[in-house]
Amino acid sequence: MATKRSSSAASKSSSARTKKSEVTQDQLMSWYKDMLLMRRFEEKAGQLYGMGLIAGFCHLYIGQEAVVVGVQGALEEGDQVITGYRDHAHMLATGMDPNGVMAELTGREGGYSKGKGGSMHMFSRDKQFFGGHGIVGAQVALGTGLAFSDKYKKNGKVCATYFGDGAANQGQVYESFNMAKLWDLPVVYIIENNQYAMGTSVARASSETHLHKRGASFGIPGEEVDGMDVTAVYDAAQRAVEHARSGKGPFILEMKTYRYRGHSMSDPAKYRTRDCLLYTSPSPRDR
C-alpha cells in the first residue's frame, strides 16, 4: 500500500503552490494499484451489501481514492491516521489486510474488531490507524488529542485527521482548531470535500464554502487541492506534513473531490442528476 513545506497563515490555492515534488514511475504505479484495489474493494462491498451479507451502515469511498493514497504517500512510518465513517480505503492505505477489513464488514470473528465493529468501527494499533468513527466530527477532537500525545512524547510524528465538508460545520472542530494552534500540535486536518453532506450541498450548508479558510482566525494555514489528482494531493500533503512535523503547528488541506455513489448504501442520491457525475473513468485520474 501507499507508504511511506512550510506555508504562511494565509490560505492559498494549489495552483499557487511551490515547486512540485519529484514523483517516480514506480510511485505512480504503486498509487494506481492502491487506488484500483480500493475501487474494487468498495465495489465488492456494495455488491455484498446488496446480497444482505453486510449489515448496518456502509459508506463507500468510490471516487475519492486519490485523496487517501496521495496523503498516505507523504506520511512516515509511525504517523497516525484517524477518520470518520467512510473509512474502508483509509484502512487499506495504511496497509491493513483487505481480508481482515472485509471480514469485519461481514461480521466475522477474523475482522479487525472481531466482527463487532462493522463498517464504521475498525482499528489497528500496529498500523497506527485509530478509526473509523460513527459520530460526525468526533474524530477531529480525537486526532487533535493524538497529536498532543505526539508532541508530549517528542517523537516527531504527525497525525493525519480526516473529516468531511459536513463535519466541518461541527462545533468541536473549531474547539480542536483553537487548541491545536494554541499548542502548535503536529496535526494535518484533511477536509474531504466531496460536495455533499448526506444530501445537502456545501453551498446550502456553509456560509464560507472555501473550507480551507476555516482556520484563518486561529492562524492555521490552509490550502485547496484538486482531490481527483493524486500527484497534486501528494505534493500538497508533503508540504502540510513538513509544516506540522517541523513544529509549526496544524495545517488544513481541503481536498476538492467527488463521491460517485450515495452518502451510504441506503441513499439513492436523487438530489443530483446524471450530469453532475463529471468523472466517469474506472479509476481516479493521476494526471
What are these regions (language model features)?
Residues 2-55, 77:
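Cofactor-/ligand-binding subdomain signature composed of acidic, glycine-rich
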Residues 43-46, 51-183, 201-207, 212, ...:
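Cofactor-binding active-site loop characterized by glycine-rich and histidine/acidic residues
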Residues 89, 195-198, 259-261:
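Short gly/pro/ser/thr-enriched loop/turn and capping motifs at secondary-structure boundaries
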Residues 167-171, 230-235:
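Active-site glycine- and acidic-residue-rich loops that bind
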Residues 185-189:
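A glycine-rich helix N-cap at a beta->alpha junction
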Residues 195-200, 220-225, 270-278:
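Short beta-alpha connecting loops at secondary-structure transitions
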Residues 232-268:
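Structural signature of the thiamine diphosphate
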Residues 279-286:
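Conserved small/polar residues in nucleotide/adenosyl-binding loops
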